[in-house]
Curated annotation (Swiss-Prot):
Function in brief: This vanadium-iron protein is part of the nitrogenase complex that catalyzes the key enzymatic reactions in nitrogen fixation.
GO molecular function: ATP binding; iron-sulfur cluster binding; nitrogenase activity; vanadium ion binding
GO BP annotations, alphabetical order: nitrogen fixation
Residues the entry annotates as binding [7Fe-V-9S-C-homocitryl] cluster: 257, 423
UniProtKB keywords: ATP-binding, Iron, Iron-sulfur, Metal-binding, Nitrogen fixation, Nucleotide-binding, Oxidoreductase, Vanadium
Full protein name: Nitrogenase vanadium-iron protein alpha chain
Species assigned in the record: Azotobacter vinelandii
Length: 474
């Protein structure tokens, strides 16, 4: 049976349906892990909430927009400054977040007046910013505050501003994935086709599902500029509020993160007939394939091949240097959703690194279907993995490096296993040709860092001898 019940889960046997071990000659469609389902009580889930999926992942990335969190201060603090998505206007989105700072009395008597006051104060404090997104949180949703009515009143009082509301409290879904969906659908229902922008190229597209982590969007933008393609809107990396209102003007929707942003691409296709094209931007082979797909759509294949050749000539020798030193290493991926299937084949093909275990916090069954198809036999696939499962899986597969976020990364350090930040990156960008060399460099530095050997020594134990560190030793 390919579904696995770990030792730590023996008292929660329901978890067996969420953990899959790929075996030879199996129809993986029969054995997909249950995903996008409510967390089993007692499993200590590491998932983010639905509000987090809307604000932290998508809305909070916009570079020219006030982010107003209608709720307790903690909801704003928890989703501020935890993602590295810089912008070309001084990182406005990373510097500021706004909260109505709801207290017990506001929950009892209602918070709409407090929200209205906070919105006016925010616009007064930031006179150059005319756009705002307002989010509900658990307490303000439970008491029924009508944030749409408040937003309409503020826009009536201030005709030069525009406000978008996201009614996605943390409890509204099983994971942050619900927040992605709510914001996607809300935006196309309320804001798309409310503005027109100047079209300057015969080739136009929306780039959807990229959030400019450490400059991903800005690096890929250099490719689109060289190909002569105008990006109408970035959803939402280094993007602007008003550009997203013009998404209906594009000829093509290019989707990178399908889990967080595929919904709006599907709706743009239904309502405006704009085709959807999914690509992978991590990895040399995947990036080249994505460029070829886009160029084939626009009929500019020669330009695409020229770009790929230039990038390969510049970066492939550096990638090969790292591949020679990483070949045969084992890696575990412990991240959110689609990065599992974006990364698993790229690190294996381009770097010779074997992926031995993967866990997804908010992936759906279709995400597991993709990653299992790309993965190798003997690999573990876990939905909504918890800390105890993490320790047991790591002990079973013994990876040389782990891709995860800082939260799990702190646990990894205690196990004396190097990790690379798969959420906010160590030293990105990681997308594109140059970006994948950056990723290989960070993997190499993590795996071969001599300092980690020192961490394995308990200085309180006099029987242990401090190891001699040899330069260049693994």
């Amino acid at each position: 049976m390919p579904m696995v019940l770990l030792e730590c889960d023996k008292d929660i046997p329901e978890r067996q349906k969420h953990i899959y071990l790929k075996a030879p000659n199996e129809d993986t469609r029969e054995f997909l892990p249950i995903a996008n389902a409510a967390t089993i009580p007692g499993t200590l889930s590491e998932r983010g909430c639905a509000f987090c999926g809307a604000k932290l992942v998508i809305g909070g990335v916009l570079k020219d927009t006030i982010q107003m969190i209608h709720g307790p201060l903690g909801c704003a603090y928890d989703t501020w400054h935890t993602k590295r998505y810089p912008t070309d206007n001084g990182h406005f989105n990373m510097k500021y977040v706004w909260s109505t700072d709801m207290k017990e009395s506001h929950v009892v008597f209602g918070g709409e007046k407090r929200l209205e006051k906070s919105m006016h104060e925010a616009f007064d404090e930031m006179p150059d910013i005319k756009r705002m997104i307002v989010y509900t949180t658990c307490p303000t949703a439970l008491i029924g505050d009508d944030i749409k009515a408040v937003a309409k009143k503020v826009m009536k009082d201030r005709p030069d501003v525009d406000v978008f509301t996201v009614e996605c409290p943390g409890f509204s879904g099983v994971s942050q994935s619900k927040g992605h969906h709510v914001l996607n659908i809300g935006w196309i229902n309320e804001k798309v086709e409310t503005m027109e922008k100047e079209i300057t190229s015969e080739y136009t597209m929306n780039f959807i599902g990229d959030f400019n982590i450490q400059g991903d969007t800005q690096l890929l933008q250099t490719y689109w500029d060289r190909l002569g393609i105008q990006v109408v809107a970035h959803f939402t990396g280094n993007g602007t509020y008003d550009d997203l209102r013009c998404m209906h003007q594009a000829q093509l929707n290019v989707v990178n993160c399908a889990r967080s942003s595929g919904y709006i691409a599907n709706e743009l296709k239904k309502r405006y007939g704009i085709p959807r094209l999914d690509i992978d931007s991590w990895g040399f082979n995947y990036m080249a394939e994505g460029i070829r797909k886009i160029c084939a759509f626009f009929g500019i294949e020669e330009k695409g091949e020229e770009l790929i050749a230039e990038e390969y000539a510049k970066w492939k020798p550096k990638l090969d240097w790292y591949k020679e030193r990483l070949q045969g290493k084992k890696m575990a991926i412990w991240t959110g959703g689609p990065r599992l299937w974006h990364w698993t084949k790229s690190v294996e093909d381009d770097l010779g690194v074997q992926v031995v275990a993967m866990s997804s916090k908010f992936g759906h069954e279709e995400d597991f279907e993709k990653v299992i198809a790309r993965g190798k036999e003997g690999t573990y696939y876990i939905d909504d993995g918890n800390e105890l499962e993490f320790f047991e899986i790591i002990d079973l597969v013994k990876p040389d490096v782990i891709f995860t976020g800082p939260r799990v990364g702190e646990l990894v350090k205690k196990l004396h296993i190097p990790y690379v930040n798969g959420h906010g990156y160590h030293n990105g960008p990681y997308m594109g040709f140059e970006g994948f060399v950056n990723l290989a460099r960070d993997m190499y530095n993590a795996v071969h860092n001599p300092l980690r050997h020192l961490a394995a020594v308990d200085i309180r134990d006099k029987s242990q001898t401090t190891p001699v560190i040899v330069r260049g030793a693994a």
